[in-house]
């Protein structure tokens, strides 16, 4: 039979798997993250570009540069009226500063108008159009749209398309912007999905992804149509953009700030972030749940309404509470369920945020733990005669006291422990996950642990029969201290109770000769590795005799040459000597006396090369001599 609580553990595991499959915001900007992002943007100005990133980025987060007058002076003093890119940054920055007005000459205006051409890059067209709009100068939107569309057909990069979206947001609503708006759907198709949680462009640049989100919602707010992005895709983009918390690059910090502002303040999609205030663990003394409901910038959505759809027990899946509204308390929403009798355990709370049709990811699942205190009742210690000839001797003990006198468990009689566990707050019966009986030998330190299991009436019973349990105890008789251990993740007061002393006696023939304390953590005996002894080499006489036999054919060859009067004058002695000195026989001899196989092969490779070259050269010279004769 499965131990108590195994069914609950199984249901808990299945619920966690099901819940993790739901797409929800996993990354957003906490208040600490927002301050850190502001610090990344608040840097000394080194150029018009850096000033633009700092001023406009901080403005997106609802902040201002420390010295606006100084910032305005810096912008005016660094403006280059002959450079289109330089003219893009000042008007955008000045609009985020109070009392900073910048004007340009007619020549500069003509320069910007000339840049809105098919011959210019998408970046230059974007900068020129944004500059003209920022300076409040008129622009032929339809002509600019034609130049932008023509140029975009030649630049098909993701960044160029994003800049086209940014450009279109400055053009008149009277212009037909459909061709640019359709690019949004194409860009969404080019996004790569990572693990079903993130969406990003193939290049993996966070800056490009963030600028795409900011440009899309700015254009759609300007155009007045909902973007062709699914709500799940918005959440995936959000998870990607806000997954990074530290920024060394000023443009990257600016892009994240722009995306955060767009996702917090647009007409179509506002992701909702629901975070429990503190740990979502509630007790019977504090039966309430507080939630922070914010946008991606951790700004409270105080106008929202928060409702509990249902609260279900993880173990039984029974609905214990449903259709209940949270109460706004300052910047948080509070649910008080003091009048609802929750038994201890885990519950899934389904919470829905309403009040604005722009809200997305507005239904969340929260795992709430209801904790309680466990009480031990009806604790009986009994000595039971095996043949039932003597009535059981029962002693009742009250937690946390220890029973008086030792109890005996031996061959004629067994020892038994009975108890019940209840919820102190509600009086309901409890079956914690961990209920153990621990027996500790007072002399040797040996420990034996058993699991106490409840019966059909939830009465826990532990019985010790020495004849059946002698293996666990190694037949070690002695006085054991009995502890009751009760624990569970939902219990505020785990229990380790010294209940009584039990004298356990095993038959003498079963007792070990020496009772040793079992310590599982002592050092084990060192393992000695035995390697095979090297083979003995043959005696010197044997090796010398074998060497002589090997050399005998060579000596016989020399003797036969002398007898037949071989003419050795035709040999080229230099090469011949080298050829014969390189003979492999020498290597074979050394192999026999000194080397192993691998060393011999290495030397043979060297000798073989020299021998081959010398022999080849020698034979070639012999052939030349024969030809000459």
Swiss-Prot record:
Localization per record: Endoplasmic reticulum; Endoplasmic reticulum membrane
InterPro entries: Ribophorin_II_2nd (IPR055375), Ribophorin_II_3rd (IPR055374), Ribophorin_II_C (IPR056790), Ribophorin_II_N (IPR055373), Swp1 (IPR008814)
GO BP term, pick one: protein N-linked glycosylation
Membrane topology: Multi-pass membrane protein
Transmembrane stretches, start-end: 542-562, 571-591, 595-615
Main location: endoplasmic reticulum
Annotated metabolic or biological route of this protein: Protein modification; protein glycosylation
Cross-link Glycyl lysine isopeptide (Lys-Gly) (interchain with G-Cter in ubiquitin): residue positions: 154
Family statement drawn from the similarity comment of this UniProt entry: Belongs to the SWP1 family.
Primary role: Subunit of the oligosaccharyl transferase (OST) complex that catalyzes the initial transfer of a defined glycan (Glc(3)Man(9)GlcNAc(2) in eukaryotes) from the lipid carrier dolichol-pyrophosphate to an asparagine residue within an Asn-X-Ser/Thr consensus motif in nascent polypeptide chains, the first step in protein N-glycosylation. N-glycosylation occurs cotranslationally and the complex associates with the Sec61 complex at the channel-forming translocon complex that mediates protein translocation across the endoplasmic reticulum (ER). All subunits are required for a maximal enzyme activity.
The protein's name in its UniProt record: Dolichyl-diphosphooligosaccharide--protein glycosyltransferase subunit 2
Species in which this protein is naturally found: Sus scrofa
């Amino acid at each position: 039979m499965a131990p108590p609580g195994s069914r609950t553990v199984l249901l808990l595991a299945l619920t966690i798997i099901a819940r993790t499959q739901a797409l929800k915001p996993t990354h957003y900007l906490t208040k600490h993250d927002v301050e850190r992002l502001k610090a990344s943007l608040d840097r000394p100005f080194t150029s018009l570009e850096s000033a633009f990133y700092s001023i406009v980025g901080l403005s997106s987060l609802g902040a201002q540069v420390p010295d606006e007058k100084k910032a305005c002076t810096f912008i005016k003093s660094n403006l280059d009226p002959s450079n289109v890119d330089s003219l893009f940054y000042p008007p955008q920055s000045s609009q985020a500063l109070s009392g900073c007005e910048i004007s340009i000459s007619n020549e500069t205006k003509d320069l910007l108008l000339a840049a809105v051409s098919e011959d210019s890059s998408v970046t230059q067209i974007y900068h020129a159009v944004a500059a003209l709009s920022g300076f409040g100068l008129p622009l032929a939107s339809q002509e600019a749209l034609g130049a932008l569309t023509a140029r975009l057909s030649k630049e098909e990069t993701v960044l160029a398309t994003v800049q086209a979206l940014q450009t279109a947001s400055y053009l008149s609503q009277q212009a037909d912007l459909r061709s640019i708006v359709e690019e949004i759907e194409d860009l969404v198709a080019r996004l790569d999905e990572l693990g079903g949680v993130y969406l990003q462009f193939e290049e993996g640049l966070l800056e490009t992804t963030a600028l795409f989100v900011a440009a899309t919602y700015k254009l759609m707010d300007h155009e007045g149509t909902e973007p062709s992005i699914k709500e799940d895709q918005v959440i995936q983009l959000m998870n990607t953009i806000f997954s990074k918390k530290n920024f060394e690059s000023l443009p990257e910090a600016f892009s994240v700030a722009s995306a955060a502002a767009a996702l917090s303040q647009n007409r179509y999609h506002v992701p909702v972030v629901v975070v429990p205030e503190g740990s979502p663990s509630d007790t019977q003394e504090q039966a309430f749940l507080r939630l922070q409901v914010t946008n991606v910038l951790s700004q409270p959505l105080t106008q929202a309404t928060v409702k509990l759809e249902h609260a279900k027990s993880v173990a039984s899946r029974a609905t214990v509470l449903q259709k209940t509204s949270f109460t706004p308390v300052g910047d948080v929403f509070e649910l008080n369920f003091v009048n609802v009798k929750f038994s201890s355990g885990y519950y899934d709370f389904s919470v829905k945020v309403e009040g604005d049709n722009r809200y997305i990811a507005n239904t969340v699942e929260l795992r709430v733990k209801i904790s309680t205190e466990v009480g031990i009742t009806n604790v009986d210690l009994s000595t039971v005669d095996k043949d039932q000839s003597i009535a059981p001797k029962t002693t009742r003990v009250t937690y946390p006291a220890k029973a008086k006198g030792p109890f005996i468990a031996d061959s004629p009689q067994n020892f038994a422990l009975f108890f019940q566990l209840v919820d102190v707050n509600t009086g309901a019966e409890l079956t914690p996950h961990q209920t153990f009986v621990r027996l500790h030998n007072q002399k040797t330190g040996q420990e034996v642990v058993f699991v106490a299991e409840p019966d059909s009436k939830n009465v826990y019973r532990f019985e010790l029969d020495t004849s059946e349990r002698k293996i666990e105890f190694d037949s070690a008789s002695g006085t054991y201290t009995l502890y009751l251990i009760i624990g569970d993740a939902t219990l505020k007061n785990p229990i380790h109770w010294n209940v009584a002393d039990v004298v356990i006696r095993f038959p003498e023939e079963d007792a070990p000769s020496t009772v040793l304390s079992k310590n599982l953590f002592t050092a084990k005996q060192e393992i000695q590795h035995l390697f095979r002894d090297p083979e003995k080499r043959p005696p010197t006489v044997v090796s010398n005799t074998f060497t002589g036999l090997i050399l005998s054919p060579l000596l016989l060859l020399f003797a036969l040459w002398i007898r037949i009067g071989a003419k050795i004058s035709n040999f080229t002695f230099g090469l011949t000597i080298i050829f014969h000195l390189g003979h492999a026989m020498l290597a074979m001899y050394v192999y026999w006396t000194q080397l192993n196989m691998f060393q011999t092969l290495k030397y043979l490779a060297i000798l073989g090369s020299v021998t081959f070259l010398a022999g080849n050269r020698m034979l070639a010279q012999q052939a030349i001599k024969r030809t000459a004769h």
